[in-house]
Amino acid sequence: MDHAELTTEQVLKRDIPWESYMANKLISGTCLQLLRRYDHKPESQRGPLLDEDGPSYVRVFLNILRNISKEDTVEYVLALIDEMLAVNPKRAALFYDNSLSGEDIYDPFLRLLLKGNWFVQEKSCKILTQIISARPKMQNGIVPNGEASNSKSKLTSTQDVLRGLVDWLCSQLRNPTHPNCSVPTAMHCLATLLREQYVRALFVQADGVKLLIPLISPASTQQSIQLLYETCLCIWLLSFYDAAVDYLSTTRVMPRLVEVVKGSTKEKVVRVVIMSIRNLLAKGAFAAQMIDLGLPHIVQNLKAQAWTDEDLLDALNQLEIGLKDNLKKLSSFEKYKQQVLLGHLDWSPMHKDPSFWRENINNFEENDFQILRVLMTIIDTSADTTALAVACYDLSQFLQYHPSGRIVVADLKAKDRVMKLMNHENAEVRKNALLCVQRLFLGAKYASFLQT
């Protein structure tokens, strides 16, 4: 059978020759007794056994993984442990019982993670993630399993395991072993591991942050929605770590997050994206970009929807306040750009301020004269008379202050589009459309000369 398509249910139907292993002294008589009580029993019987003597079963499983290399048996024991933890994740604490303080509880899984087939790798990864995340925290200098907190071997072992785990997860994101399962498995484990600051540092060092960005895109199927959610959860966890934020500021993470939040109706996805954006805004590197992407307007639209999650509602309120505060701090040109991109033009002082136009005229060349193109869209489509009048006036100001203004505006085929507004019913619109056309025609001969 193809191990890449093997399921837990198929593996757990196997009959493992435990008696043969005992005869060959690979397991003890006590192990055999425990396995007979546990093997192929329903959870209603296994649960009480684990409640009564869970650490003994953990020791049996670890010994088998350490001493027996037969693939069918290794897969079977990993499936048993995975099922045990899936039924009750708190059972991961059994690995830290005092009676197991001398056991190397991580090594069997780390070894299999690097050597096994896909089924073995996936189970080892999930199990290792669960048990290392459940390790006891130090209290009064003593780790609850009885080892002193200054035990260098224990600390190094934990660090080595986390490093090995993070490296393996990054390798799966770069070059998946399984075409369909590697990436979801890696993201599921990272969404747990990145809760630790030390793991965040390891992930950044392993150049893992850039591997998340392509995974942030609108999703439709249940599986892809879960992958998107866990990816965005990882971004949220990384937003608490400055080195990760510094790296994120060099990527296209913000446009992708905004695209997701615009297109998603799944509340948990919207919540984790908004909470990520809120944290990134607080770090200060993304404010202008958020405003350029129209996030203030998006937040207003989201607030108008009937969300039930209190964390999401709080995050939306905080984000709205934060964006308003940052908008006040932005330069006059950034404020102007925000007005244009949102189509919210009014007669704020900068429009008629000669120094604004002199100081910022070259900024209008950004993104292939994006602002001029948006002004033309407003002229073509807006029903707001103030926006139309201001757009015509701003276009005339560009003609006046930019050395190649008339050529640029002519290339946009603006003349006929503005001339239509010279017959507009609103006097303010007519006046500013006329001003714009006059400035365009006054230099027509000069513009023609420059183009030859």
Curated annotation (Swiss-Prot):
The keyword Transport applies. It holds the Pfam family V-ATPase_H_N. It comes from the Eukaryota. GO terms for molecular function: proton-transporting ATPase activity, rotational mechanism. The keyword Nucleus does not apply. InterPro entries: ARM-like, ARM-type_fold, Armadillo, ATPase_V1-cplx_hsu, ATPase_V1-cplx_hsu_C, ATPase_V1-cplx_hsu_C_sf. Keywords: Hydrogen ion transport, Ion transport, Transport. GO terms for cellular component: vacuolar proton-transporting V-type ATPase, V1 domain. V-ATPase is a heteromultimeric enzyme composed of a peripheral catalytic V1 complex (components A to H) attached to an integral membrane V0 proton pore complex (components: a, c, c', c'' and d). Belongs to the V-ATPase H subunit family. Subunit of the peripheral V1 complex of vacuolar ATPase. Subunit H activates the ATPase activity of the enzyme and couples ATPase activity to proton flow. Vacuolar ATPase is responsible for acidifying a variety of intracellular compartments in eukaryotic cells, thus providing most of the energy required for transport processes in the vacuolar system. PANTHER family: V-TYPE PROTON ATPASE SUBUNIT H. This is Probable V-type proton ATPase subunit H. The lineage of its organism: Eukaryota, Viridiplantae, Streptophyta, Embryophyta, Tracheophyta.
